[in-house]
Amino acid sequence: MNAGGASFLPEPFRVPSPRRPDDETYALRTVTPPPAAVAPEPGYEIPETPEAGWDMAASGRRAWVSRGVLFLIMAIQAVLSLRLSNTAFQDEALYLTAGHAEIAHLLHGTPLPKDYAAYFSGSPQLYPVLAAVVDGRFGLAGARSLSLVLMLCTTGLLYTITRRLFSERAALAAAGLFAVMQSTIVMGHYATYDAMALFLLAVATWIVVRTDRLPAVAVLLATPVAVLAVGVKYASALYLPTILGLALLTAWPRRGAGSAILRVLLLALSTGGLLAAGAHATDLLAGVQQTTTNRVHGSDGTRYLLEQSAEWGGLMFLTAVGGAVSYVWRSRLNESPLARRLGNPGRSWRVLLGLLLCGTALLAPAYQIHLATVVSLFKHIGFGLFFAAPMAGVGVTRLIGAHFRHPQLGILLWTTALCLGIQQADWRFGLWPDSTRMIRTISPRVDAEGRYLSSTPEVPAYYLRGKTSHRQWQSVFGMEYKDRKGGYHAGDDAYRSAVRDGAFDLIVLDGLTNPRVDDIVAAAVRGNAHYRLLGALPFRNSAGTGRYRIWVRTAH
């Protein structure tokens, strides 16, 4: 036991010595000091995007990007049209020949070779004269380039109209789809009045949409343009109700029902008055009745016409219907949060707009079914789809989604439309044969005194207009003939009698335009001492192969 006596006590009975507070290593133990207070690290936070980052106001950068995309779309459209190649189609040759005849009549008093106003589906003093002026300076390529310029302007107007109605993105999508349609591609390289008529309808529509916030009287600016469109192509009147409907709907949300109704009344009365005055002051009413209102019905079936309509315009129409349904369901077209606070048109208004634009695309097929003819259907489908295109643009933007969530779907849709447009346009532009060899063969046999029969008399009358007149050429679509004994013949019998008498100095048949009458003429020529076969010129077209058969009258 030591002096303290504690060493000899058992462990449980030991009394611990008091610990000194300043000795951290007492009894050979290390004591960890308490940790110092450390400030917590800041967590990662995403700052809120200021609304200024979603600015919807116009900007120079946005405008230039949009214009660049639109320019690219129009460049693609131009290339697709310019790549088409063939000699003049009979309609092109007819309008250009008529235009040259009208110019000679106006400037020199030369009698018209035919009464063009009686059977043209547009005024012969409007587009044919303009196209003939261009043709006289630049040839057929120049006349076709005029159509291309008009169709490019139409695409630009469609972009502007859609941007005004909906949004920038929808406008670019609408222009992109419209630019690659068969109708657009072909009409852009077609020297007929269709491109000019559609352009004028587009201008009238743009004026109506652009003046929606101006006083009602401003809509009268569209009146002369709309009337001129009808004068260029009488069937353009089919789309005047759509323009009137847009005059009502575009002004209603901003200027109220009274101003909107006044706009419609002003536009309807002024347009109707000008049309009535024009019909009364000119001799065009007979042409309107023969080619439009009282047109002879064909024999094409309803199912066939529906199939053709679906093939040539179904994809864009379905896209427009999808856009209309989505627009009715949700009107917002901008991703900016600011758009939620903007006043949007009501659902009833959106339903009416969707029905108006999409329903217009059905007018041409319905009218052609009524007439039971596929003639010009592909062009008229393009007229209707021009008005449905803004809704198709909305459909594409909804398909892609906000912030370009599904761009592959939009690319797939546009690529499909592009492939269809190219294939259909190539097929369309190859339907008629190349007439180069035929014109070269008959040129030495044609003069200003002879009388000629042709499946497509407009083509040689156009290419050989320096040597012959349109009045010298007889078509295979109806004929009257007085034989040498004074007997009168009409229809098929007229062809037989005229060939039997050797009335024609030259006969040119292609077997395509009217095969039934071609066979009648060929049978009448067979064994006829008045004629000998000058040549059988083979050709190839979209339907296969064929040949020009050319007979020339013998000397006796």
Residue ranges and their predicted role:
Residues 77, 94-129:
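Extracytosolic helix-loop segments that constitute the early lumenal/periplasmic catalytic or substrate-binding loops
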Residues 169, 204-219:
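Membrane-interface transmembrane helices that cradle and orient dolichyl/undecaprenyl
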Residues 89, 147, 183-196:
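Short acidic/glycine- and proline-prone juxtamembrane loop motifs at membrane-interface regions
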Residues 1-79, 266-267:
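Start-transfer (signal-anchor) and selected internal transmembrane alpha helices
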Residues 267-270, 330, 343-350, 390, ...:
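Signature aromatic-anchored transmembrane alpha helix within multi-pass, membrane-resident enzymes
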